[in-house]
Amino acid sequence: MLLFSLTAITAVLAVSAVPTPSNNKDGSTISELPENWDQTKDDNRSLFLNKSDKNDLEPYPLALSEEGNQDGYDQTVDQRFDSPQSNGELDNLIMRPELYGEPPAMEGLASAFDLQRRKRGSGTKVGGAGAATKVVTKSGSGKKNLKPEDQAALSPIDLMTQHEAQRRKRGSGTKVGGAAASAKTATKNSGGNKKNFRPISERRKRDSGLSAADVRALLNLWEAQERRKQEYANQFAADRYYGRVNPDEEQPEVDENGDLWYNEPVVIGPHDRDYPHHSYFSEQNRMALARGYPDLYQVGPNELAQRYEEARRKRQYANKMKRFMVAKKRSDNMMHQNNYRPRDDLYTLAELLRSAPRVQEQDIPVYRRLIL
C-alpha cells in the first residue's frame, strides 16, 4: 500500500515538472499575451495551428479579443469611437461623422456669385469698327454690352431686368410714319418731330383700316360662332346618352281637341325605327341626324331585322332550354360559393326578360328594359 502511494506522488511531481507547451519565442504561455499584440501582423505568434484557419477569420480582427476579455474589447470599441486622435487602423470610414457634415449655406454662395457678376459686368468693351469704348457706370448699365458667354452666366431675373431697361431706353419714342423723320429727334429732352411719334403705350402692332363699327361686328360674329360651337357640343353629348332630341317637334300635352297626345297612336319616323337605338350599326346615322344632315346609310326594314337578329344571336343564347338551365345554375346558392356571388330570383327574372327575343312591328315603338 505504501508502495502504491509513493508511486502516485512521484507521477504527480513528474507531470508538474513538464514545461507548458508554448507557441512563442520567449517561452511565455499563451494566456499571457504581450501588449499591443496583433494576430494579423505576426505569423510567428499566431494561435492557429495552420494558416488556413487564420485566413477564415481574416475579416474579424477582434475575434480573439472578444473571447475571455470582454472588458478589453469594450474599451477598444469606446476608444475607437470616442478618441479625438486615432491612429487610423480601426476607424470605421462609413460611420465617421466628419464625412456627413451639413451642406454649405446657399446665402454665402449667392452673395459671392452676385459680387463676382457685378465685378465682371461693371465695365465692358463695346465692339465696333475701329473704336473701343469702355462704358463704366455706377449702376452697372454696362451689362447690356456683355459678351454672350457672360450673358449666359446671368440669372433669369437679371436677364429680364436688363432686357426691360434696354427696351424702355430704346423705345422712348416709336416712329409712326415718314421716311425723313429720324428716331434720334424724338427723345424726352429734345423737342423732336412729335407729329410722327407717339408714346410706346399707344402704339399698335398691326395698323388696319377698319373702323370701330367693323371691329364690333367682327367681335359679335366671333362670339356667335363660339356660342354655336358650344351648343353643338352640348347637343351631341345629350344625343349620345339620351337619343336624338329635336326641339322643333315639341308639342303641348293637350292638343286643340282636348285630348292627351300620348294616349293616341304614335307614328314613328323612318329614322327612329332602327332598333336597338344605341347599337353599332345605327351610331353613324344618329351622329348625322344630330347635326341636321341627311342619313348616311339608308337601312331598309328587311336589312334592319337581319342585322338585329345577328346582333342578338351574338350576345344572347339561341336555345331557350339552354338559357333557362344556365339561369337555374346561376341561381343555385350552393354552387360557386367562393368565386360567384349568389343572385336572387328578381335579378334572374330581369335577366330573362332582357334576353327574351322581341319583334319590331311597323308602327309600334319598342322600349328597352333597363336594369338599375
Curated annotation (Swiss-Prot):
Keywords: Cytoplasm, Secreted, Signal. Detected in the brain and frontal ganglion and in the axons connecting to the corpus cardiacum and corpus allatum (at protein level). Detected in the brain-subesophageal ganglion (brain-SG) complex, fat body, midgut and ovary. Expression in the brain-SG complex is 2-3 times higher than in the other tissues. Residues 38-57 have a biased composition (Basic and acidic residues). May be proteolytically processed to give rise to a number of active peptides. Residues 18-89, 136-208 are annotated as: Disordered. Residues 1-17 form the signal peptide. It is found in: Cytoplasm; Secreted. Residues 177-191 have a biased composition (Low complexity). Residues 19-31, 72-89 have a biased composition (Polar residues). One of its GO terms (cellular component) is cytoplasm. This is Putative neuropeptide precursor protein. It comes from Bombyx mori.
